[in-house]
Amino acid sequence: MRKYSQRHIPVMVREVIEFLKPEDEKIILDCTVGEGGHSKAILEHCPGCRIIGIDVDSEVLRIAEEKLKEFSDRASLFKISYREADFLLKTLGVEKVDGILMDLGVSTYQLKGENRGFTFEREEPLDMRMDLESEVTAQKVLNELPEEELARIIFEYGEEKKFARRIARKIVENRPLNTTLDLVKAVREALPSYEIRRRKRHFATKTFQAIRIYVNRELENLKEFLRKAEDLLNPGGRIVVISFHSLEDRIVKETFRNSKKLRILTEKPVRPSEEEIRENPRARSGRLRAAERIEKGGD
């Protein structure tokens, strides 16, 4: 694994623990264990609870294993997609869990590590895969999909409402794209200079988000898992989801609202405190929603 020195700061830890309410002898399923920050905080807070942590990224899992090695008797980590969590639990002989945590953000390692292709800040191969065993890369998507399909992806997944077609056209004109800076160049050429100046965030943020979501099937996977999540929880068990853009948040909100087996604990999404945002600016866009499995309703 590459040398990596960036410190990962998990988002909204206090709120996660407050809503999950981990207790001794209870099992928490961390669906996006990442570098292990939330899991470590939960295990420190609750000396008798157990964590089952999963992630598709084998590189961040190795970081999590190191971070959680002092809790090896209470933390079990697995490389698997959360959409297959029900299969994993069955394999482990775990019928139900008492808490589910999902932190849908890109990890610090994925952003700051080398050659993952998630960042527009430096030149890297156009990869963007969270699961390095997947065959679909950003480079393949950007160089092979038709212009119309690229425009749809950028419009829907990047919420790039005005300039999606122009960006898609420039991507096609600039083919082949091989690095992250090739994609930045195409977006820069597509946007009017006044639009670049007007944007509060980097002008390529929306396009990078769109391609990343498509490469990793993020929204499809989230929908598929949330449909099953309520049946993985014991009565009184809780699910906590932290999302970082409106597409994810909308899916979580609607799934919770439409469920007959969940009681919503957060009528509106909980946002990070101003103090946390000062200490960790990446927390700014975080939105936390929580729900509790009720006794009745479809069993």
UniProtKB/Swiss-Prot annotation:
Keyword terms: Cytoplasm, Methyltransferase, rRNA processing, S-adenosyl-L-methionine, Transferase
Broadest EC class assigned to this enzyme: transferase
SUPFAM superfamilies from the UniProt entry: Putative methyltransferase TM0872, insert domain (SSF81799), S-adenosyl-L-methionine-dependent methyltransferases (SSF53335)
Example of a GO cellular component annotation carried by this entry: cytoplasm
This enzyme's EC code(s): 2.1.1.199
Origin: domain of life: Bacteria
Compositional bias (Basic and acidic residues): 268-282, 289-299
Catalytic activity: cytidine(1402) in 16S rRNA + S-adenosyl-L-methionine = N(4)-methylcytidine(1402) in 16S rRNA + S-adenosyl-L-homocysteine + H(+)
Protein name: Ribosomal RNA small subunit methyltransferase H
Gene that specifies this protein: rsmH
